[in-house]
Amino acid sequence: MNYLDLARNQIQNFRSSKVSQSNLQEKTKILKNLKILTLSFKSLPPSKENPIQAEFELAREVNELEMELSCLCKNERAFELSYLQVKPFYFDYIKGILPKQSDKYLYYVGLYLLFLLSNNRTTDFSTELELLDIRDKKNPYIKVSMDIEQCIVEGNYSNLARLKNSNDENY
């Protein structure tokens, strides 16, 4: 079994059951092993070798899993570091290495935007929004962040309660 198949199997193992408080240590161990495994990916930066699309896709997914796990653990530092590691996969590597993925990445960008707002980092929030195109800003995960920011700017805190109910538990 090659290293890519091993990574795919570990990702499948991670996703086989929902992350909960009861299996948190097991999921953390799997993720740690996945992060170590991605170090063996020969084409990831700062390598000068030709990029291998499968390695980039798996590395992106490992960082997304880490973001999800850090949300559950309420570890803000790990969440931010995970986002900063996955961000190039969303905005930089799509030029010639990774195909433009579905809107799945907007889920993670939206979480990060909420993180920035919750830490009163409105300048960073605005900077991140500028990376998105107009179509992306209409996505529900991005729109809720923009609506919350608008309520904060206007001082309209009564509308924040209305925005509180979202379809996703991480939001």
Placement of each model-derived feature along the sequence:
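"A position-specific structural signal for the A-helix of alpha-solenoid helical repeats
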Residues: 9-12, 58-61, 65, 69-72, ...
